[in-house]
Amino acid sequence: MLTKRIIPCLDIKNGRTVKGVNFLDLKDAGDPVALAQKYAEEGADELVFLDISATEEDRKTVIDLVRKVSETINIPFTVGGGISSVNDVEILLKNGADKVSINSSAVKNPQLINDLASAFGSQCIVVAIDAKQINGNWKVHLVGGKVATEIDLFDWAKEVENRGAGEILFTSMDHDGTKNGFANEALAKLSQTVNIPIIASGGAGTMQHFADAFLLGNADAALAASVFHFQEIRIQDLKIALKNNTIQIRL
């Protein structure tokens, strides 16, 4: 078993870190640069920085903030939000991002995945997929979960892998912000469907939820926001608990 990763997510709106429940009712969870530094020092394996206003308001990701965050931390760092071209990615990588995450733009223009993988290598291309169950079937949603599609989660995951994505960041819209645990059945099915790493997102509330995502969901990494931002779970404590649960983790 490869070492599992713990990834705090910084949702950014207007230059501040925010976190809502089910993608609505955003609360201010602080300064992104300070939070990034805190997480790096506490032992986070990676960070994800999503400019959640970028796609919706057609605003490009906050380049200055990316630069400041990258100057502050020494762990891998993924940036998403408003990315729709090879040029967008080039700018982000030049300003310190290690990887980029694309979501709505990949669904609207799947060829973008091929183009980015060709230009920069699969290792820095993460495709984020937001999905929820509609009549028992997992369907992909766009624009922060606001727009439903007819696309099947597992078909889309296979396609993004075939097009060159290096990783999938899967958020269950049904679980996001609820703190009731990750979508482990869907995660397990995803891990059987594709051979690239899966990052689990949506539903973290307890340390056991992280263990379940790895042991039941076969996730390669687990991402969370509010439990870290509001210090309900400390990363170091979480990692020790996971290690005690026979999960391979970097302490």
UniProtKB/Swiss-Prot annotation:
Cell compartment(s), UniProt: Cytoplasm
One Gene Ontology cellular component annotation held by this UniProt entry: cytoplasm
InterPro entries recorded: Aldolase_TIM (IPR013785), His_biosynth (IPR006062), HisF (IPR004651), IGPS_HisA/HisF (IPR050064), RibuloseP-bd_barrel (IPR011060)
Highest taxon in the source lineage: Bacteria
Pathway in which the depicted protein is active: Amino-acid biosynthesis; L-histidine biosynthesis; L-histidine from 5-phospho-alpha-D-ribose 1-diphosphate: step 5/9
One of the GO BP terms on file: L-histidine biosynthetic process
GO MF terms held by the record: imidazoleglycerol-phosphate synthase activity; lyase activity
Any Pfam family: His_biosynth
Active site, per annotation: D11, D130
Reactions mediated catalytically: 5-[(5-phospho-1-deoxy-D-ribulos-1-ylimino)methylamino]-1-(5-phospho-beta-D-ribosyl)imidazole-4-carboxamide + L-glutamine = D-erythro-1-(imidazol-4-yl)glycerol 3-phosphate + 5-amino-1-(5-phospho-beta-D-ribosyl)imidazole-4-carboxamide + L-glutamate + H(+)
EC number, UniProt record: 4.3.2.10
Enzymatic class: lyase
Record key words, sorted: Amino-acid biosynthesis, Cytoplasm, Histidine biosynthesis, Lyase
Subunit structure: Heterodimer of HisH and HisF.
NCBIfam families linked: hisF (TIGR00735)
Family named by the database record: Belongs to the HisA/HisF family.
Task of the protein: IGPS catalyzes the conversion of PRFAR and glutamine to IGP, AICAR and glutamate. The HisF subunit catalyzes the cyclization activity that produces IGP and AICAR from PRFAR using the ammonia provided by the HisH subunit.
Name of the protein described by the UniProt record: Imidazole glycerol phosphate synthase subunit HisF
